[in-house]
Structures are given as structure tokens and as C-alpha cells.
């Protein structure tokens, strides 16, 4: 199982759909994708994690790095996740306070706070 | 002797293999199904940390994972050979860059958040993370 990435634009948001496993081996690909989007001027990102089977601290580090990058441009990075085992990792690291986590892409795209 | 022992070159692509093997052996040993995700994540974090320590220190020897099935418990020991400056030193960033320290600490934070019984040791010959989970007796596991 590898990492799959696809992006699409919804209004002023860019949705990054992630599938597979985000770990020390695959996380650099996600980092590259986020860096590329920000460099191309996409500052409002929605990362859809519904297809993610595994996430570790390396993946969390990449997401935090992405958040730092978009914030430098007054942008946003929202997550879509309903999977308890993935949410648990955000909770034990305290990152639920850092990332807005939504239950659907529609909700994340509509969010403005 | 370990029930299953795994040695792998300190490369990120092998961490997934270690996770899969550890989860398979843990399941066989009777670790609760609900906890297997945690085992997978914790062993992945420990191996990721060991790979980083070996790479930062330029160590070419493999990372060692021991999966030990005991009565009523299952243990995983992940050992690295990265020397620490002082015995008992838990911060491995001393010889490497500061950049990796954050990720290393996040990995340890995840492990201690997930596993109740965890022991981290380090010395001049390397370090070890030992994690232990209770197992269900086989009779109960079959029912």
C-alpha cells in the first residue's frame, strides 16, 4: 500500500484527497504536494483524510508544516476525517486544537471561521 | 529468546514491513484486536525513530526488533545502535541537528500516549524502546 494523492479546486479552496499510508517513507510525497500547492498560490487547503489507512507522527509533522506555510500567506488548512483511529492520533498529540477537523469535504469547504 | 526477531537496514521503506510483522505476531500472541492498531502505530514510531537515529549518526548496522510472546503479555523491543553522549541521555539530537529533535519527540509522545507500559533506555552503545501489552488467554480468545 502506497500513498495516493489527488487535488481538485472547489471555489477558492484546494482539496487534497489523500489515500493509503502516511508514514516516514511516504510523508515526503505529501510534503512535496503541499509545498507545491502553496508555491503555486493555493493558500486555502482542505486535506481529505477519509482514504487514509495509517498516519504516524511523520505525517503529523508534514501537516503541521503545511499549516505553517499557508498561515504565512494568511491561508488555512482544514482536515476532513471521521476515522476514530486517525482522530485518536490528533487527540493524544494535542493537535485537535491546532487543526480544524471536519466531517465532510462540503463542510470544510464551506467553513470560514 | 525472542518469539520473532527482525533486523532491517535503517531505511524508511522497511518501517512498514516491521509494522506488518509486529501486528501479525501480536495478533497471534493474543493481543486484543482493538489494540492492534495501537501496536502497529507504536512499533512504527519506534522504528521510525531508530531509522532516524541510525541515519543521523551514519550507522550502517540494522535496526533490531524483537517480538516476545510471554505468559499473559506481549512485548516489543526496538533497538538502535546510535550512541548517546551520556549514559541515560534521552535526547538523541545532541550529535545531530535540532530539526530532527521535534519529530523524534513527537514520535515518543505518540508512543507514551498509546502504550501504558513503555520503557525508554539509552546509553553509549545505543538505545531501546520496550513496549508491553497484555494478552488474552488462548481459551478466551477462541470463544
Curated annotation (Swiss-Prot), chain A:
Keywords, A to Z, come to: Phosphoprotein
In its keyword annotation, does this UniProt entry include Aminoacyl-tRNA synthetase? no
User: Residues in domain STAS?
Assistant: 3-112
MF terms per GO, please? Answer: anti-sigma factor antagonist activity; identical protein binding
Describe the PTM: Phosphorylated by RsbW on a serine residue.
Residues with Phosphoserine modification: 57
Query: Which InterPro entries does this UniProt record tie to the protein?
Result: Anti-sigma_ant (IPR003658), STAS_dom (IPR002645), STAS_dom_sf (IPR036513)
Pfam name, any one: STAS
Does the UniProt entry include the keyword Phosphoprotein? yes
Q: What does this protein do?
A: Positive regulator of sigma-B activity. Non-phosphorylated RsbV binds to RsbW, preventing its association with sigma-B. When phosphorylated, releases RsbW, which is then free to complex with and inactivate sigma-B.
Q: Which family does it belong to?
A: Belongs to the anti-sigma-factor antagonist family.
Spell out the protein name for this chain. Anti-sigma-B factor antagonist
Origin organism is Streptomyces coelicolor (strain ATCC BAA-471 / A3(2) / M145)
Q: Gene behind this chain?
A: rsbV
Amino acid at each position: 500500500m502506497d500513498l495516493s494523492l489527488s487535488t481538485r479546486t472547489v471555489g477558492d479552496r484546494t482539496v487534497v484527497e489523500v489515500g493509503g499510508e502516511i508514514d516516514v517513507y511516504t510523508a515526503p510525497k505529501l510534503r512535496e504536494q503541499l509545498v507545491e500547492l502553496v508555491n503555486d498560490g493555493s493558500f486555502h487547503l482542505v486535506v481529505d483524510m477519509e482514504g487514509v489507512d495509517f498516519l504516524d507522527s511523520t505525517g503529523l509533522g508534514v501537516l503541521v508544516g503545511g499549516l505553517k506555510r499557508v498561515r504565512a500567506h494568511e491561508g488555512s488548512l482544514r482536515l476532513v476525517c471521521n476515522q476514530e483511529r486517525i482522530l485518536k492520533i490528533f487527540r493524544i498529540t494535542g493537535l485537535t486544537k491546532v487543526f480544524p477537523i471536519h466531517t465532510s469535504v462540503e463542510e470544510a469547504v464551506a467553513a470560514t471561521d | 529468546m525472542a518469539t520473532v526477531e527482525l533486523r532491517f537496514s535503517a531505511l524508511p521503506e522497511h518501517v512498514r514491513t516491521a509494522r506488518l510483522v509486529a501486528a501479525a505476531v501480536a495478533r497471534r500472541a493474543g493481543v486484543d484486536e482493538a489494540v492492534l492498531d495501537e501496536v502497529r502505530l507504536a512499533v512504527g514510531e519506534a522504528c521510525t525513530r531508530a531509522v532516524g537515529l541510525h541515519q543521523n549518526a551514519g550507522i550502517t548496522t540494522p535496526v533490531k526488533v524483537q517480538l516476545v510472546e510471554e505468559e499473559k503479555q506481549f512485548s516489543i523491543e526496538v533497538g538502535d545502535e546510535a550512541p548517546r553522549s551520556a549514559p541515560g541521555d534521552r535526547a538523541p539530537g545532541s550529535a545531530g541537528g535540532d530539526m530532527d529533535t521535534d519529530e523524534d519527540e513527537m514520535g515518543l509522545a505518540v508512543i507514551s500516549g498509546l502504550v501504558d507500559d513503555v520503557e525508554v533506555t539509552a546509553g553509549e552503545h545505543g538505545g531501546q524502546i520496550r513496549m508491553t501489552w497484555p494478552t488474552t488467554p488462548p481459551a478466551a480468545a477462541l470463544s
